[in-house]
Design a protein with these regions (language model features):
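Zn2+-dependent metallopeptidase catalytic domains
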Residues: 1-137
Length: 137
């Protein structure tokens, strides 16, 4: 059976297909989302091309798309309809998500790319929105 969390959502307004999502879908979906995000972030950090807004910041904005989608569904469901199984998964996920966040924060190569953009920001002709997003990184 297909994991509804990892399949494209064809529902109205691209809402999660709640009728197809099962509790046992969450753990593998989180693992897939973490693996995808780690690979995307490694590709950004290890990119030999000079840092640009597109190949660094825009890419970072998309790097965690699957993970964000899975987490959004899970934490909304777990927060509104808690069960022992969902609480157990939250306990299992907490250190994994924390470690992932720390990996990003402590990634020197990634920081170097963001710092290069920050130092060159006045010469980059960024839109107001891009300037704000860069500042947030």
């Amino acid at each position: 059976m297909t994991n509804a969390l990892l399949a494209p959502w064809t529902t109205a307004f691209a809402l999660p297909p709640f009728d197809l999502i099962r509790d046992e879908d969450f753990a593998p979906a989180f693992e897939a989302g973490l693996a995808e995000a780690r690979a995307a972030i490694a590709a950004i950090a290890d990119n030999p091309a000079p840092a640009t807004f597109a190949n660094t910041i825009d890419a970072l904005e998309l790097a965690e798309a699957t993970l964000d989608r899975v987490a959004g569904v899970f934490f909304n469901i777990a927060g509104s309809d808690s069960t022992p199984a969902r609480e157990a998964l939250q306990r299992d996920l907490a250190p994994k998500l924390s470690a992932f966040s720390s990996e990003i924060t402590n990634n020197r190569a990634l920081f170097g790319r963001i710092e290069a953009l920050w130092q060159a920001r006045d010469a980059l002709s960024l839109t107001d929105e891009q300037q704000r997003v860069l500042m947030l990184y």
